[in-house]
Amino acid sequence: MTQDGTWSDESDWELDDADLADLAEAAPAPVLAIVGRPNVGKSTLVNRILGRREAVVQDIPGVTRDRVSYDALWNGRRFVVQDTGGWEPDAKGLQQLVAEQASVAMRTADAVVLVVDATVGATTADEAAARILLRSGKPVFLAANKVDSDKAEADAATLWSMGLGEPHAISAMHGRGVADLLDTVLKKLPEVAESVSAGGGPRRVALVGKPNVGKSSLLNKLAGDERSVVHDVAGTTVDPVDSLIELGGKVWRFVDTAGLRRKVGQASGHEFYASVRTRGAIDAAEVVVLLIDASQPLTEQDLRVLSMVIEAGRAVVLAYNKWDLVDEDRRDLLDREIDRELVQIRWAQRVNISAKTGRAVQKLVPAMETALASWDTRIPTGPLNSWIKEVVAATPPPVRGGKQPRILFATQATARPPTFVLFTTGFLEAGYRRFLERRLRETFGFEGSPIRINVRVREKRGAKRPGRR
């Protein structure tokens, strides 16, 4: 080991089993979505899977007001269980809203459990959701809930008619059958979330932003000006809510364009589903084009959508729309707003556009390509540790508790987004981690992509490993 604490021999860069376990935890876990009509027991099932009371459970349809995700562990397997949100149903809009929920789930989850009340049987809404899920190509499991009697057992058997295979008879309230259901699900659930695994086909783009910011206008401009909406690409299954558009000589998949085109107020629950669809579009995308109204001050809504994007870890392009309405005074104010409000996303490329006039819209394509290239980037372990050695020698970590922590070793655990794990002898202050991120960007680029830095505290090989922080 060198004096500054980094490893000098490349043989020391090989990871032991404990290190590999740390790296596995850095990879995004697969997502299991729990979907179904209101009051069929979705949140009760989530709580049963988690082994603790997390999801709000009341005997009132629509009590879940948003899509909520929880980290879960079953027989040593990590995964994320997603409690899809409820709504205030009415007789007219119920079927459409259940279908909407299933549509979001099938694009953002790696597997789906459809929960049906066995004592009621398959309703029209249940069957509509089943049809959508069958088209998704994702693993789908049917949970026949509220099976607490012999009669309910017989009722569950009638659900074979839904075409989803064997109905798994469960009682989320009492735990019956849930373990067997999970064992079956985990056999089909991938080890890592598919959203971050390399795959073929067009790159996935989400246009997001607050209402009336110009998402639909931009989509129409991109599709209409190019005269190149693609309906059939070999080997590609297209979700009805997506659009394939050729831009810059390649085909891009714009996710959830049906959500952009639908008129506000067309169905009950639209305000709730505006939020759900935004989250769903971000989760389904690889790169997010975040539209901001350049002619108006930044709002809380802008910042909420921005938080969703950062949390999801997607590549990002900031599109300042309505630039045709911006005068010199507004430009000065906007620059100050960006410096003050968007400090956490300075790494995103900014493109000033007008969806209405078409100004600079073509510049979005190279910005998206740059962001995706950064998002996909992997730094080999050798160059990464050589870089760490130079940085630490010039600027060591600050002393903490009378001791100076040393960075022993660094590796990139995953791409999409680039996630780095630093093995250290002590905790690194948040300020020093931000410093390392800045230096990473200066050296390796990463324009348009978030970077995640995780710290694992350990001693030199052969020493007792302290707890993680």
Swiss-Prot record:
Ligand binding (GTP 2): 209-216, 256-260, 321-324
Domain KH-like residue range list: 377-459
GO BP annotations, alphabetical order: ribosome biogenesis
Alphabetized GO MF terms: ATP hydrolysis activity; GTP binding; ribosome binding
Superkingdom as given in the UniProt entry: Bacteria
One Pfam family of this chain: MMR_HSR1
Keywords: GTP-binding, Nucleotide-binding, Repeat, Ribosome biogenesis
Binding site for GTP 1: 36-43, 83-87, 145-148
Residue stretches making up the EngA-type G domain: 30-193, 203-376
Gene3D superfamilies xrefs: 3.30.300.20, P-loop containing nucleotide triphosphate hydrolases
Oligomeric and partner information: Associates with the 50S ribosomal subunit.
Record's function text: GTPase that plays an essential role in the late steps of ribosome biogenesis.
NCBIfam families associated with the record: GTPase_EngA (TIGR03594), PRK03003.1 (NF002828), small_GTP (TIGR00231)
Assigned protein family: Belongs to the TRAFAC class TrmE-Era-EngA-EngB-Septin-like GTPase superfamily. EngA (Der) GTPase family.
Identification of the protein by name: GTPase Der
Originating organism: Mycobacterium marinum (strain ATCC BAA-535 / M)
